[in-house]
Amino acid sequence: MEDIKVMIKPDWVSWDEIHELLLAAHKKNIEKGVVMNTTTMTGEEIKNYLGESGRCIVALCGNELVGTTSVKIAIGKSWFDKGKTVAKGTMSAILKHYQGLGLLEEMNELTNQYMKEKSVQIIEADTAEDNVMMRKILAKKGFKEVRFFPAKNQNHFSVYFVKWLEGCPFSDRFIQRKFNLSKVLTKIQYGPGKVERSHFLSRICQCLKKLINV
């Protein structure tokens, strides 16, 4: 197998190629009817989502794009990250033939280096409610479940995770209560398939979420 190089995305790798890789890598999930936000975004939308402060890492076998991951940097606005410099890992994908070679670890080394440069205080991630394995992995890595939500452009519920790099400022009990409240209100608001039960009920749940800040 030709040598694989991991690097910051060069200009000659287009954002449309990143989009096509995400589609190819997540083909099985798509066939199962699992809609993922990263696979519904166009190349231009991916570029705009990451913004100027984001960083896209790629794995190249010759001139072929075989893997990618990205990190988005922002200032937090929620109860768990307000005013903090936040990094969110996103859009990770590796073609099946190249999995198991440690490419994700290599790409993550570059994203971790970038996060240090940006003085990141909090790392965030999300995964599908039913992805029990990933939820366990994130928990073992020190992430806490802070929010249950219906993600945009997805047909399933997701769980949002946070890891405070400078020490967690909240008690486990407080965090669990916030998460449980967001889950209960979301389940009241939406039925199976993430379908709103009624417009009136949805508005009430949205107002309650804002009122109790979840």
Report residues per predicted region:
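A short beta-loop-alpha structural element at the N-terminal edge
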Residues: 2-22
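Conserved GNAT-fold acetyl-CoA-binding loop/helix
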Residues: 9-12, 23-47
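A short, internal acetyl-CoA/4′-phosphopantetheine-binding micro-motif in the GNAT/acyltransferase core
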Residues: 90-100, 127-128
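Conserved acetyl-CoA-binding loop-helix of GNAT-fold acetyltransferases
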Residues: 94, 100-113, 136, 140
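Conserved active-site alpha-helix within GNAT-family acetyltransferase domains
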Residues: 129-147
